[in-house]
Amino acid sequence: MASIQRVTARQILDSRGTPTVEVDVTTGEGVLGRAAVPSGASTGAYEAVELRDGDADRYHGQGVLRAVGHVNDAVADALHGMSVLEQVAIDDTLRALDGTEDKSNLGANAILGASLAAAKAGAATLGVPLYRHLGRATARTLPVPLMNILNGGEHADNNVDMQEFMIAPAGADSFSEALRTGAEVFHTLASVLQDRDYSTAVGDEGGFAPDLGSNEEAVELILDAIEKAGYTAGSDVFVALDPAAAEMVEDEAYVFWKSDPDTERSSEDMVEYWAEWVDRYPILSIEDAMDEDDWDGWAMLTDAIGDEVQLVGDDLFVTNTKRLTRGVEEGCGNSILIKPNQIGTLTETLNAIETAHTHGFTAIISHRSGETEDTTIADLAVATGTGQIKTGSASRSDRVAKYNQLLRIEEQLGATAHYPRLDAFPLTN
């Protein structure tokens, strides 16, 4: 039966030195599943609740001993004796135990740790990789990496408003070739920045975080790096953006706090702004181009450019099927970012992906800015066949760990491995 014998949690540190939760699920046969939970910096208002201790004398209030205690007590008791092969039942039990819509009782960090650790124990029990356990025999699609090589916004201490400037090597023939392309462009960008006496210090997600003359200069630098690396922008490598617009809003106006704090922009202004960027640059995808509460603005944006570029809802949808369904009904966006800790269980995460695909939306598996060495999202991307992943730049071991896991999976799949190229972005075809 592979029943759960023991569930234990501990407090560990994430990539920012901030405490997070790690959970072990052990079966009666001694099989172990272990998962560590990430944490975001720019979090959506509608995400599941991450439980923190609030004790100013420990980790400046950011400790997670309360969440750890919930796992070691209530969660351990509730899951004892359950089969690790019954993921839906496990997650239903966790949700019922918490009893809230936003996981605010036990904490999404406690619940997700247990959920993912159980899934890993299930895979280990069957003697198969996690991607095979979750995706069955048909799982063979490697994701196009959206590599965050220039950081701004909440992810960097610089004067760049946009949070992420990414490259998508969608012209490569395989995942390993795509990763090589991304790494080469990343290292070339370092040289481009150095030539202009810009800093090559990196932000939370491994991308460079220099002070620049404008947001536009960030894109121009990336295009220069693509060319100098020997690739062609718009066919080999594309640009993707995450402005994180929710961080730019005050009193229903959009303000570029770092570069232009005295100018207020309306939703209509932002739609015009992004349409102009899409016309000017080889942009494949824009995430969180509008605020999480600006449903009308999202609809306007989707109507304006939604037939030519991927418009991704992160803070808008927060991996939540209810918010995603509203977005579908109101014509807001055409893609969803998938972050398991936004919703709190693996089953709910999988349901969000299924809902997206049912309605013709793309889905992108994503890390958080505060990461660990846990590689679950790499397996999740292959298991669900989303065809896209966001897991940072080609630096920082917490980011590269996911890429290395995808390389291993590609090797395991051998000739059956599929790299979707531009097919992962149907609007571009």
From Swiss-Prot:
UniProt gene name: eno
One matching Pfam family: Enolase_C
HAMAP family reported for this sequence: Enolase
Protein name listed in UniProt: Enolase
Active-site residues, record numbering mapped to chain: 205 (proton donor), 339 (proton acceptor)
Organism: Salinibacter ruber (strain DSM 13855 / M31)
List of residues binding Mg(2+): 242, 287, 314
Signal peptide positions (record): none
GO molecular function terms attached to this record: magnesium ion binding; phosphopyruvate hydratase activity
Family affiliation: Belongs to the enolase family.
